[in-house]
Amino acid sequence: MGYSKGKRVSAAVGVTLVLASASGGTSVMNAIVPFLLEGMQVNLTTFMIGPTVATILSFAMSAIGVKIIDIISPKWCMLIGSVCSALTMYMVGTATSFVFWIIANVLNGIVLAFATYAAAGGVIAVFYGENTQKAFGVVGGMTALLVAAWMAATSGLLHIMPYSQLFTVYAVGIVVVGVFCNLVLTGKVPRRKATLKAQPAAGAEQGDAASQDLPGYTFGETLKKGASIYFFLIAMFLVAWCASGITSYASVYYTSFGMAATTAAAMLSLYSFAAAFLKLASGFILKRIGAKAMSIVIYLGFAAGIVCLLVWSQTQLFPLAIVGIVLCAFISYATMIPGLFVPDLYGMKDYTGINSAGVAGYYAGAVTVLFGLSIVIGFLGYFNAFVVLAIAALVTMAFMLAAVATSPMRGMKGKE
């Protein structure tokens, strides 16, 4: 692979810590939505305009994310993400006006667009090559584990200090972690274009041959290779309804049916721990059972979790609240699906490009769910809104299975 084991491990640790500190901030904010609503004195629909702005920006920038990653490299994208995440955390903690809340979410949109999982996939692919799936799964799992610990600590700290002070401390920590990990642990990461130019001087012909040796297709080629990529992008759009729906609305769902806000925050911490262990094994599970079976497990698991939450809301049987949120954690694979599934469905020839397209599809869905689901809640109530999430999971599963069944890589492997 061209890198020592120590260098690969160091890079993976750096990526993990940056992801946990930068993208984890969004998870922490989701866990304290009831506190933020009280602090800003706004209703849920108005509050969700902020995250909607963030996801609109995320979608718009994800569409050009691969270009940005190519120009300034995945490592620097992640450093930008750390800085923006810190600013977001500080502004959310001190926001008492709706304008500050919107500005904070604009910054968060930049973070989510290209500075988290899309950039992380680019870094991991450089260091791990054909083992990218396993490495990415471990990185995602460890990231989720760290975020879960962070959320658990947050739920405890909220008892002894106001969230405004807590978020200021978090903002400083995110910058420190981001700078250290990007500059020291991850170190130098070659740009993709520079890497191609660095092919042996026997030159363009040898470089082209090396490119052709990579199995798979470019994003442009997949658009002409049948319906698989379209099914895949639709599935990524729909899965955002499930993933963003549960993480953004679970805490207010719980409190709307009588649960204390601090207990609701602890439940999201439990979700994060469950997600962490699932993500940790994701690459190995995918290699063992394949994309088709894994898709079924992800979406049926989530749907079963929603059913448990629905029953809990009517019976107040606390174990169902716990089982439900744990099963819902299967949907936490959502943002990792492009990084995990792309090699099997479309190969490694344009891993970063197709990965970025999948992330863009996800944020296109997230644009609609944050504001759309709040409207559904306003008209139908929390119970029926969560029924919609369960249905969305089953529809998403159908599209993802169609993407797997029509994958162009199946034909390529058949020819071999």
Model-derived segments and spans:
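Conserved MFS/SLC helix-loop-helix module at the cytosolic interface between two early adjacent transmembrane helices
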Residues: 60-98
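Extracytoplasmic
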Residues: 10-44, 61, 65, 151, ...
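Helix-loop-helix hairpin linking two adjacent transmembrane segments in secondary transporters
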Residues: 139-190
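Helix-to-loop junctions at the C-terminal end of transmembrane segments
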Residues: 61-73, 279-290, 377
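Cytoplasmic helix-loop-helix junction between adjacent transmembrane helices
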Residues: 106-141, 347
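C-terminal transmembrane helical hairpin of 12-TM major facilitator-type secondary transporters
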Residues: 290-341
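Extracytoplasmic gate region of multi-pass secondary transporters
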Residues: 29-36, 222-280
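A late C-terminal transmembrane helix in Major Facilitator Superfamily
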Residues: 331, 345-380
